[in-house]
A protein has these predicted regions:
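Alpha-helical transmembrane segments and their helix-start/interface "positive-inside/aromatic belt" motifs
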Residues: 6-31, 95-110, 138-144, 174-191, ...
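Alpha-helical transmembrane segments of integral membrane proteins, especially early/N-terminal helices
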Residues: 26-42, 68-73, 100-119, 145-156, ...
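Long, glycine/tryptophan/cysteine-rich extracytoplasmic
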Residues: 2-83, 124-131, 215-287, 332-357, ...
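Hydrophobic alpha-helical transmembrane segments and immediately flanking/interface helices
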Residues: 94, 135, 139-143, 205-227, ...
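Membrane helical hairpin/interfacial module
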Residues: 62-110
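Alpha-helical transmembrane segments and their membrane-interface junctions
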Residues: 192-208
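Cytoplasmic membrane-interface segments at the C-terminal ends of transmembrane helices
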Residues: 2-14, 83-103, 122, 153-183, ...
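Hydrophobic alpha-helical transmembrane segments of integral membrane proteins
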Residues: 96-132, 185-197, 267-287, 309-342
Length: 460
């Protein structure tokens, strides 16, 4: 995307970010609402109010009908809305985008849904004059819910594009993306394994689920129950995750945990057949394996890039805290008040701490066993310097010799060596005879036998 927020292409992208996911949700909700009214042979009075209420319900805004509050909204639509917002904002943001363009993208992702929320509130207020049982929700609660959902999606989308660049320019540690990736892996593992447990429990309680489907005789009614069960399946998975980590989930007075179950009335929703019934069998204690396996996934993700001890532990703690915060947020969004049944949700006082302790404890053990802690290289000890011995000094005599040679050269220049007197021949005189060394035989004494005279000549 170009850094200039003007032009046809930029305006089209910003419009897609602002209204794309919200308009798609409105179209789907309108189609389902009109289909329901047509099948029920009902008139279209208040259809717009129902559509607006359902759109706000996607953003976890409670709906009040006839004095009864429906605060437990399905998690699947809100998760799809977060995913759609993250996808559109990521597509409109490039890794090289300036902060000016990024601010425009985030503002569009928040401004468009808030505008639709204001219109929906006005439509509901107008429809409540016709449908007296429909009540207008709190405006602050409605706008806050819409802002929260789209802010989470925009943060995920923009962070995926420029998060690493922002982190490089900040003083924060460089292992933060790895910690967030490990937290996402832990959350997906915990929720996914809880879903497997939920499906297994539905198979075990198949007869109970069949009885819940029997409350309606029409095919369309059973189809509607199936759709509702699919929409509320993530809520049940989050409750199963709370039970798996040692916390508890409750539907009104009915409370469920891995150690005990207190019975009570539950809504006639087929997916709720997965909840255990008292007395609790010992097999449910095996749910703790789900928490341990999810913690192993966190530790393995943190061990992908080994770090020294303290940074490795810091990365694991950040990952565990992020995962605990995400699960707590899912538990809060998936709960609420359900009419006469009372409050539905998880125990928030123990859910997030339990997730954190599982991920830190088992995750640290996995981190150490998987080689995620890098050992610091040992510092090479310098070799000891040998002390100089008196008889092994080699350089000093050479320096002295050089100095002696320099002194001798200076003395030689100052005092030239004496030259022997050489006799110079004078004109007219014969050259002097060369001096030869004396013959040693001249000094020998030989006995005279009379054959030679004193001059060395033979006698006659």
């Amino acid at each position: 995307m170009d850094n200039r927020p003007v032009g046809t292409r930029q305006a089209r992208e910003l419009l897609r970010v602002a209204f794309g996911p919200s308009v798609v949700a409105l179209v789907v909700i309108a189609a389902l609402t009109l289909l329901q009214l047509l099948i029920a042979n009902s008139d279209m009075t208040g259809a717009l109010g129902a559509i607006a209420s359902m759109w706000l319900g996607v953003h976890q805004v409670p709906v009040s009908i006839g004095g009864r509050e429906l605060g437990v909204m399905p998690l699947l639509p809100v998760l799809l809305m977060v995913w759609g917002t993250a996808r559109t904002t990521a597509a409109a943001t490039s890794p090289q985008s300036s902060w000016f363009v990024t601010r425009w993208v985030v503002a569009s992702a928040l401004g468009g849904p808030v505008l639709i929320a204001a219109i929906s509130l006005a439509v509901i207020h107008d429809a409540s004059s016709v449908l007296t049982e429909l009540q207008t929700p709190n405006a602050l609660r409605a706008v806050g819910g819409v802002l929260a959902v789209h802010a989470i999606g925009a943060t995920i989308g923009v962070g995926a594009r420029i998060g690493r660049r922002t982190l490089t320019a900040s003083p924060l540690p460089t292992w933060l993306p790895d910690a967030f990736r490990a937290a996402a892996a832990g959350v997906l593992a915990l929720v996914g394994l809880s879903g497997v447990v939920m499906v297994g429990s539905l198979v075990v309680h198949w007869s109970t689920m069949h009885d819940l489907y029997a409350i309606t005789d029409s095919v369309f009614g059973q189809f509607s129950l199936t759709v509702l069960s699919v929409l509320y399946a993530p809520n049940v998975m989050v409750g199963t995750a709370a039970v798996a980590v040692g916390s508890s989930a409750h539907v009104g007075l009915a409370t469920f945990s891995s150690f005990t179950v207190f019975g009570g009335d539950i809504p006639a929703l087929p997916v709720l057949a997965a909840v255990p019934s008292p007395p609790l069998g010992p097999v449910w204690v095996a749910l703790l394996i789900v928490a341990a396996a999810s913690a192993v996934a966190v530790g393995q993700q943190c061990a992908r890039r080994p770090l020294p001890l303290m940074p490795a532990l810091g990365k694991l703690i950040v990952a565990a805290a992020t995962a605990a915060l995400a699960m707590s947020l899912l538990g809060f969004a998936g709960g609420g008040r359900l009419g006469n049944f009372g409050d539905v949700g998880v125990d928030q006082a123990t859910f997030a701490p339990a997730v954190f302790l599982w991920f830190v404890g088992i995750g640290a053990l996995t981190l150490a066993m998987s080689g995620g802690i890098a050992r610091r290289p040992k510092r090479a000890t310098p070799a000891p310097v040998p002390e100089p011995e008196p008889d092994m000094v080699e350089d000093e005599p050479e320096v002295l010799d050089d100095e002696a040679e320099v002194d001798e050269a200076e003395v030689g220049e100052a005092e030239p060596e004496p030259v022997d007197n050489v006799a110079v021949p004078v004109d007219g005189e014969p050259p002097a005879e060369e001096e030869y060394p004396e013959d040693p035989e001249d000094h020998f004494v030989v006995d005279d036998d009379g054959t030679r005279d004193g001059n060395g000549e033979a006698a006659e």
